[in-house]
């Protein structure tokens, strides 16, 4: 299989959002050009991926992966942290970096619960009535405490993009889930109206997940 490489970053995932979407949002926000390679656009995704694995040595044999000058970086969360640090959206100072990472880790916890509900149909009632309002309350309080429209400091970090990506997913299934969380709802709207993010969302190809 031959790919046309146009930019310095080459990002590989399936034709879906999943664990790749936050990374794509980071690229969009930063206006960093990259080659977005998606298995399954023109055929069998898993056949394409299996052929790809024969050509390249991939840590853990899974995607997403980010290739930079022949160096392959794996694990979505590690890629998020790498890009955020590289492009200075990881928080100003050691403590803010910690808080951004703390919120990012929290997002992973609730996103995992949502995926179990959305993809595997597990405990939807419990998620909708207990887990989702509980975690939304956590994020609401963090915004209230920071009191700057952002989760960390007074400017955007990858924590803001991670929370946005989470609720971009959740609101597609539960559109009224933030009605009792005004600060969180306003924050999601704030991020969604950043010009680069707005343009990316408007032009994003639809996918099953």
Curated annotation (Swiss-Prot):
Keyword Transferase found: yes
Domain of life where this protein originates: Eukaryota
Record keywords, A-Z: Transferase
CDD domains: GST_C_Sigma_like, GST_N_Sigma_like
Pfam family, one: GST_C_3
Annotated ranges, domain GST C-terminal: 93-209
Chain positions recorded as glutathione binding sites: 62-63, 75-76, 109, 121, 125
Domain GST N-terminal residue range list: 7-91
Keyword Transferase found: yes
Enzyme Commission code: 2.5.1.18
Gene3D superfamilies: 1.20.1050.10, Glutaredoxin
GO molecular function annotations of the record: glutathione transferase activity
Enzymatic reactions: RX + glutathione = an S-substituted glutathione + a halide anion + H(+)
A GO biological process held by the record: glutathione metabolic process
Function comment: Conjugation of reduced glutathione to a wide number of exogenous and endogenous hydrophobic electrophiles. May also function as a storage protein or ligandin for parasitotoxic ferriprotoporphyrin IX (hemin).
Assembly information from the UniProt record: Homodimer. In the absence of ligands two homodimers may interact to form a tetramer.
Similarity comment: family membership: Belongs to the GST superfamily.
Name of the protein in its database record: Glutathione S-transferase
Species: Plasmodium yoelii yoelii
């Amino acid at each position: 299989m031959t790919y046309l490489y146009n930019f310095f970053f080459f990002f590989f995932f399936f034709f879906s959002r999943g664990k790749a979407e936050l990374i794509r949002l980071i690229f969009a926000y930063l206006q960093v050009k990259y080659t977005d390679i998606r298995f399954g656009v023109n055929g069998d995704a898993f056949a394409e991926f299996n052929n790809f694995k024969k050509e390249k040595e991939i840590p853990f044999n899974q995607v997403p992966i980010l290739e930079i000058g022949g160096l392959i970086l794996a694990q979505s969360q590690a890629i998020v942290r790498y890009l955020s640090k590289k492009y200075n959206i990881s928080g100003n100072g050691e403590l803010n970096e910690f808080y951004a990472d703390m919120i990012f880790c929290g997002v992973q916890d609730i996103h995992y619960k949502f995926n179990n509900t959305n993809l595997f149909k597990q405990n939807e009632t419990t998620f909708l009535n207990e887990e989702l309002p509980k975690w939304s309350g956590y994020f609401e309080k963090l915004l209230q405490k920071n009191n700057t429209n952002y989760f960390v400091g007074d400017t955007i970090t990858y924590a803001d993009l991670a929370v946005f990506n989470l609720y971009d997913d959740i609101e597609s299934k539960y559109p009224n889930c933030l009605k009792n969380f005004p600060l969180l709802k306003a924050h999601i709207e704030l991020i969604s109206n950043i010009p680069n993010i707005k343009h990316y969302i408007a032009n994003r190809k639809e996918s099953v997940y």
